[in-house]
Amino acid sequence: MGCQGNKPPIALFIAGCAVVLCLLFPHAGPGADGHPLDRFVLSDTDIPGFSIIRGPDYYGPESLWNYIDGGALPYLDYGVRDVVTYTGLWKPDSLEIVVDVYDMADSRGAFGIYSNERFPGYNFIEIGIEGYLTDNSLCFWKGPFYIKVFTREDSPSTTAPLDSLAKALDNRITGSGGMDAYFSFFPEEDRLAHTEAFIAKNVLGQDYLSRALSVNYKRGEEEYQLFLIMNKDSGTAGGNFLKYREFIRQYGEMTEKTVSGWDESFIGRESWYGTLVFVRRGQFILGSAGLSDEKLAQSHLKALAAGLPR
């Protein structure tokens, strides 16, 4: 029947096995045509004293589970596109170092997964857009990339090789792709450093709320958060606002107070987040969670909204 005819059963079986293997296991190498992340695979030529002893291995969204198991879920939520990982030996100290490079497709996704894994008390360093150093790891993000350089030793004698490798990787990222411009609209008063976050899904514990920016604040002994939730259009935002308002009405406490100057608003209280002041303008939902001073919360939201497109 020619080239377009039906394949015999054994051929179909072999083809099916090949598809399953491709999904379950990473590529052992870049292949004849190379891989988009090959430029991040360092060698002794790039870093004298460093040589790869395992890998590189390449993963995609379908196979990342095989590398980091359940840890893959947040990476998938933030839009991971490609991953390369390899282990090298730092010969001067006989130290094995692992390099993970995550291509998160865009800078918002890279920052999002970075912000999901870092804590405000970390030792932050100047690398990429932002990075931090622990006893055995150096992690940073820049553009669409989130990069982790670490050793499995709890307390290596030196972190100098981590720094050398990270700087070499940083230099291979063209452009900046820095912090989301919307963060500049969040008020500075009471703002806590290194608490900015991009939340991809389940904002405020609600599965219908996604794509939010948040910043933590502290006033006296009271800690609170400001949220900017981005929706695709005003209709979607209105529907989501209604759902959240009804959730608070049912499971929290809803007051009769409203905030003037917005498309919609409510003031309520919830056991986990405390006092809530939420408003909507067009496609944006803005909220204060945990600040008992309702007037100050309204002032913060007004300042945040001043920079948003109408």
Where are the regions that the model predicts?
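Surface-exposed amphipathic alpha-helical segments
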Residues: 38, 153-182, 291-310
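A short acidic-to-branched-hydrophobic micro-motif
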Residues: 76-114, 149, 214-240
